[in-house]
Amino acid sequence: MRAVIVDWSRSPFTRAHRGGLADVRPDEMAGQVARTLLQRNSIEPALIDDILVGCAYPEGEQGYNIGRIITYLGGLPNSVPGATFNRLCGSSMQSILTAASHIMSGWGECFLCGGVESMSRVMRRGFNWSPHPVLESSYSQAYVNMGITAENVADLHGISREEQERFALTSHQKATEALQAGYFDDELAPISKPDCEIHQDDCIRPETSLESMSHLPPAFTEGGSVTAATSSPLTDGTAFSLVCSEKFALANGLTPIAAVIAGAITGCPPDLMGLGPISATELVLQRAGWEISDVDLFELNEAFSSQSIVCVKQLGLDPQLVNLDGGAIAIGHPLGASGARVTCKAASLLTRTGGQRAIATMCIGGGMGIATALERV
């Protein structure tokens, strides 16, 4: 039985600590988007088999199994269970792949899949960071700062600061063009606050330039090449999708936009975690029975310019087919929500462009990569 994505929606992605969602609880914003998605598809909430929610730091306001909390805040009945997944940056792509595998095995027919992260309200590494002392001393790479991994990749592959800045500028230019063309309108669900609604992403910088980027100091190491401009910003946001069987979609008047053909998760050295998409993409191609030339477009989450550049080069991708509307450097990277965004964005782009096949992929902290192969229905 094939698993299909029938619709998706996301909140605006806004800058942590100073953006429009900094004062909104993550469970609240996730509940609002889940409710919006169900209402616009006129689906009976009781028909949802499970809510699968990705979250990189599931504690504080994101704790106590936020997947189950969203059952209540999203207006679903108590009969619908909920679970929280943590594969760091790949958490909500994992939720989609888990739903797809359940559908293919006959263990369910309709799942609400997504993720959420408030990087304003739940700090990176959580509230009580406590690494294993022996592992930290004997293999410190296991806990390496993500910015250091970006520097490592840049050094290993000879990616200059200027090349990283050109990549970042292109991401902002693509996202600005998409914003002006209204390409984000259908995917955005406004978030209601007591005094206003948040309607629009606020990480995109239409005014940015190579000249302005050139003045920024290195962000992670003295004399390094990675800056704030060539890193994805700390971001608040949430994204959800409806993943169901083709049979369920037909019976309930839902229109599939893409089928989940295959998924893959691989490991890599943690201090080079940004290279994870290379092996994950190679494996998902193998499982789908495709060649790289069979794929019409790619969504590659841009954690950093350096790792994105190397992934594009190593996989032999045409840059014109990658991140048509920009990536996380421009749009933002709320950790637990990004996997759902890139997967569903790839599905939507197949409809918009008339393409047949897409791959969504991303790197994962700790040294992993994840990828999903999609085919237009």
Language-model segments: what does each one mean?
Residues 26-42, 66-70, 95, 146-153, ...:
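Short, well-ordered amphipathic alpha-helical segments that serve as non-catalytic structural scaffolds
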Residues 149, 184, 194, 261-330:
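Active-site pocket-lining segment
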Residues 55-109, 129, 141-148, 207-233, ...:
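Conserved catalytic cysteine-centered active-site region
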